[in-house]
């Protein structure tokens, strides 16, 4: 792999450094940060002097990092600006500004909104709105030049899904009635989503953004409860807040189940597109599918368990009803399917992934007939996994094992 020290947009960075240092007395001797000279890893056969290759390498550095370096993002944006100015005077450079260039430019602008949101207080996020607008403008230029680009469609979906919570939902109350057309924005994002084989990790991130958005919508109005310690994944769950039909989130809230189905189907398609079955991306996607299946199993599981075990004061056995049998069957099917994906997601180096399988085995055991051989088998599998995980982590998951042993 070729590596070189990268100094993108040096003049722009020098200007920015002077502006920033001005608040400290305008010193010209400011200490350079590590982002001024970054080691960029380029693919085999890539010209290390190619400016677009450098730009792509820098973006990947940011994309695969902790994403806490606003200065690096500004460097990417400044370099994109410089290349555009150069392209206005250099026909050869103009030809090189491909769809990936426009994608990187738009992505960098949209990522900067995260930092701008942290800077802006109150209910108006003017900088956030401005940067999202600039990102979409840049994307429209790219799509005009490259109308068949799937990468630009994917980036458009990402920007929309990032914008809905960051610019709009954060300021909403339960009684809000603003006309924000959020449902249409979500539908536009789904319509433009496409799996790009050269950017599978970005494809995965876009789907994760939708997953996060649906979770936000489900928990909307319960933010204070969650802050006080009620987990949105608690066993008893929390009821959806009833919104007026005029509320900006009403339509999205009404279609949460359908959107989860679309999301799971898209994750399935993404998993099939990943050729490296032992990659972390494959395991992450498989885990996401497994978790969505467990989530779908929650309602029928709750129905079954409440009918069969709901009356703690009644010592007599409860006869299964048609409703409980149907709920039990559906919950079992979904949980067994979830287990298949969670087993694919296991990482031999990460005991947490083993424990996730064990917990799903416990869920399955709870859905099997009381004290049946199948139930005992499910619990035993979970116990074996938990003992292995505890041994590897010096008892980190002992509390889960203790709870399981109380069942037996």
UniProtKB/Swiss-Prot annotation:
Biological process terms in GO annotation: positive regulation of SREBP signaling pathway; regulation of translation; translational termination
InterPro entries xrefs: Nro1/ETT1 (IPR024318)
Disulphide-bonded residues: none
Region (Disordered): 1-33, 311-330
Nucleus as UniProt keyword: yes
GO cellular component terms attached to this protein's record: nucleus
The protein's name in its UniProt record: Enhancer of translation termination 1
């Amino acid at each position: 792999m070729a590596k070189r020290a990268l100094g993108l947009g040096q003049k722009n960075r020098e200007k920015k450094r002077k502006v920033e240092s001005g608040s400290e007395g305008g010193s010209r001797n400011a200490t350079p940060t590590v982002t001024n000279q970054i080691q960029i890893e380029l693919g085999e056969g890539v010209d290390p002097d190619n400016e677009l290759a450098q730009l792509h390498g820098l973006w990947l550095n940011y994309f695969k990092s902790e994403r806490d370096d606003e200065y690096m993002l500004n460097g990417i944006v400044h370099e994109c600006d410089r290349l555009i100015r150069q392209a206005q005077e250099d026909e050869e450079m103009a030809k090189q500004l491909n769809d990936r260039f426009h994608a990187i430019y738009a992505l960098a602008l949209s990522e900067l909104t995260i930092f701008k949101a942290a800077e802006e207080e109150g209910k108006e996020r003017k900088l956030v709105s401005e940067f999202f607008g600039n990102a979409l403008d840049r994307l429209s230029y790219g799509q005009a030049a490259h109308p068949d680009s799937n990468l630009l469609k994917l980036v458009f979906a990402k920007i929309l899904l990032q914008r809905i919570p960051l610019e709009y939902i954060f300021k909403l109350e339960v009684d809000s009635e603003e006309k924000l057309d959020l449902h249409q924005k979500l539908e536009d994002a789904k319509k433009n989503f496409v799996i790009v084989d050269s950017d599978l990790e970005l494809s995965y991130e876009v789907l994760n953004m939708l997953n996060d958005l649906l979770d936000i919508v489900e928990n909307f109005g319960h933010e204070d409860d969650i802050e006080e310690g009620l987990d949105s994944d608690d066993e008893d769950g929390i009821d959806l807040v009833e919104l007026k039909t005029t509320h900006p989130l009403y339509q999205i809230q009404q279609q949460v189940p359908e959107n989860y189905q679309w999301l799971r189907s898209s994750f399935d398609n993404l998993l099939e597109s990943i050729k490296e079955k032992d990659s972390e991306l494959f395991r992450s996607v498989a885990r996401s599918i497994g978790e969505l299946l467990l989530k779908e199993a929650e309602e029928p599981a709750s129905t079954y368990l409440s009918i069969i075990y709901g009356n703690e004061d009644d010592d007599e056995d409860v006869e299964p009803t048609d409703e409980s049998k149907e709920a039990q069957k559906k919950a079992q099917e979904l949980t067994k399917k979830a287990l298949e994906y969670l087993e694919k997601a296991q990482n031999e180096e990460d005991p947490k992934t083993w424990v996730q399988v064990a917990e799903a085995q416990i869920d399955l055991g709870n859905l099997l007939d009381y004290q049946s051989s199948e139930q005992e088998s499910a619990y035993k599998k979970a116990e074996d996994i938990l003992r292995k995980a505890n041994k590897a982590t010096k008892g980190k998951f002992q509390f889960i094992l203790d709870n399981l042993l109380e069942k037996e």
